[in-house]
Amino acid sequence: MEQPKKVADRYLKREVLGQGTYGVVFKATDTKNGETVAIKKIRLGKEKEGVNVTALREIKLLKELKHPHIIELIDAFPHKENLHIVFEFMETDLEAVIRDRNLYLSPGDVKSYLQMILKGLEYCHGKWVLHRDMKPNNLLIGPNGQLKLADFGLARIFGSPGRKFTHQVFARWYRAPELLFGAKQYDGAVDVWAAGCIFAELLLRRPFLQGNSDIDQLSKIFAAFGTPKADQWPDMICLPDYVEYQFVPAPSLRSLLPTVSEDALDLLSKMFTYDPKSRISIQQALKHRYFTSAPSPTDPLKLPRPVSKQDAKSSDSKLEAIKVLSPAHKFRRVMPDRGKSGNGFKDQSVDVMRQASHDGQAPMSLDFTILAERPPNRPTITSADRSHLKRKLDLEFL
């Protein structure tokens, strides 16, 4: 058996918990106080490659975000050729809970999990932070049953007038329709939509809207809620990648979730409002009658949790099953085939859809095959002076 290794004269590494694109997550013991922690080790690479901006952004944000429903950042330091980020240790995640068929989730259990998700988001939005990567395996669960938001690598500060963002955020199944139509300016409504998807997933015990491409994702959304009309979402036609879809009438939400309470359906319908300006806010959602009607939210200590994450996942995703902290994205971003057009990039798949629409064909019925290209490398910050980085991190954690 491999002996535990000490890192930075303080942390005693135990077993590997997970492995992703940018590094490894270890379970470790803090020799300073004996507590169990999770250490995310990120490869810095060669001098010319620099430090991954995502990791530094996550450190910066989590230093400012202190809340019972947000993962706690304990420490961060460079060691040898790696950047180490130390977090509180969490036992499992919400995806493992949802997938474990041996667990029964009562209406009170679902209400408790959703309430903790929304409380974490309410704090983030109060600090003008968008999470932008809400999904069940980024919602970690600790020994006391408390759910905490994690993986803030895609998070951004919002609220500045005119500020533009990329629309390629969130795993596709949790991506709001305005993002799928290429919106560059958005706010906390995108997190609300994702939280609604997670809410529905808790109720159904499976992902709610499972598109296999961005186009198919829109088709799944329209099949569930009907094709939006101009009076429902006036700004829709102004979005960069907007294409007119074949009209589909909205089915009854009750037909999709037949056993759910009326209060839960009402909250879901407000979280899935097409127009982001009219979509319910996190603060409004927490005040919805769903949370005050019976049954009451279950005490976190009494919430069901899987005995083993690995047992709760399919055998073909074992590494994903044991991730504890900031796991790698399970759904690789699918980028349409792009060709240069002027000074920017033009989405050829959108051109195909527009042409089909002009020809009188229904884009929703077309069979589009979008090839998955490797996304461009994330921008990096030069790390030539690593001693400067170490001094900076040391000062910040004094």
Swiss-Prot record:
Q: Which Pfam families match?
A: Pkinase (PF00069)
Residues recorded as bearing Phosphothreonine in the entry:
T166
Does DNA-binding show up as a keyword for this record? no
According to its UniProt entry, the protein's GO biological process terms are:
cell differentiation; regulation of cell cycle
GO MF annotation: an example: protein serine kinase activity
According to its UniProt record, the EC number is 2.7.11.22, 2.7.11.23
The protein's UniProt keywords, in alphabetical order, are: ATP-binding, Kinase, Nucleotide-binding, Nucleus, Phosphoprotein, Serine/threonine-protein kinase, Transferase
Active site, UniProt feature: D133 (proton acceptor)
What protein am I looking at?
Cyclin-dependent kinase D-1
